[in-house]
């Protein structure tokens, strides 16, 4: 009944309900539903507008069971469900791969001596060669060279990393990851470490973090929808392992001390290493390189659009939905002759965007490793609640704040550390009309 009363424009609500309905079909349907009611549920699944998108989130055997259910074949769905339950139970008895790696970690790797000439480096859970860890690493390569062995956590090969000095690349949560994490005397991370990956006595852990906070963090948050209930406890435990925490400014220092419950004496208020490039003597050359890499034509105004991650875009563990609020079609019509849009989204949803209809006007920089280089290639920045504006402001270029859901976001999701209507370095725009008008001027 819920599916029938939802308005067509309520896409996010439909997507969430579709997901929960799929979970019902996947976990309970064959065992709980009477055979005579099977056609009704099959019809409900057949009418799901988001079927193709939601089904992608499930494994091959789950998809098989759901597809059979969608055809109303209850008899066939039951044995598939039983097989899935058996498979899951068997996997639990055997243990996951990382569990076996941790056995080696406890009984072998952590009994081997620490290597104080090894540096373990990770940026965004191994997703990219980027951010402050990248620039600290390159500085160490330049000034210390072979004095240290550098171990980079990176899931995919990086041409930029390959051009640097000697290093070792390991994949996140691989056996080599567990080995080097157990033995390296130094760690440089820009996000929290895995809960199981506890450092040994004698290890020096530098946490660079990844941005000046605009949205409330950790112990400053009243409600957390995209994290488990023990989020704050884990955050506190992680912070106890950090020997030092980098802060970009006094504002960040005050926030980190309170939100992370962290010792102020261990906060290094030095600014972010990643921002050094914004003051480089050759920044115009770097900007030209970035445009060439992304295929952006020379001579066009580059509009960087970097919307933040919203907690209400989470709908299940590890699963997210996203709808782009900026009207790209209208921007193309208004500014396509002399401008292009460079889109930079959160890594959670970087892979689910389809921009084919805007080819030649919108360039997806979401997978580009180094956002600091994107700043140099951009003439203007449009964001909302993302802390990117703190970094972009170093360039003293125009910044627009497209906060179409300002009231909802500020009051219901996380809240802000700043009074956005009074303290932001640019106008707050709540409609596409306002964005177009601002870009014209």
Model-derived segments and spans:
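Membrane-interface aromatic/basic loop that binds lipid-linked glycans or pyrophosphate carriers
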Residues: 4-8, 30-114, 120, 138, ...
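Conserved nucleotide-sugar donor-binding catalytic segment
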Residues: 1
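Extended catalytic core of nucleotide-activated donor transferases of GT-like folds
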Residues: 134-138, 166-233
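Catalytic binding pocket for nucleotide-activated donors in carbohydrate/polymer assembly enzymes
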Residues: 356-360, 387-441
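A nucleotide-sugar donor-handling region in carbohydrate enzymes
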Residues: 102, 214-315, 319, 441
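Donor nucleotide-activated moiety binding/catalytic core segment of transferases
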Residues: 170-186, 192, 342, 347-390
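A donor-sugar binding/catalytic signature common to diverse glycosyltransferases
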Residues: 187-216, 368-413
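Conserved catalytic-core segment of nucleotide-activated headgroup transferases in glycan assembly
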Residues: 128-142, 273-355, 429-431
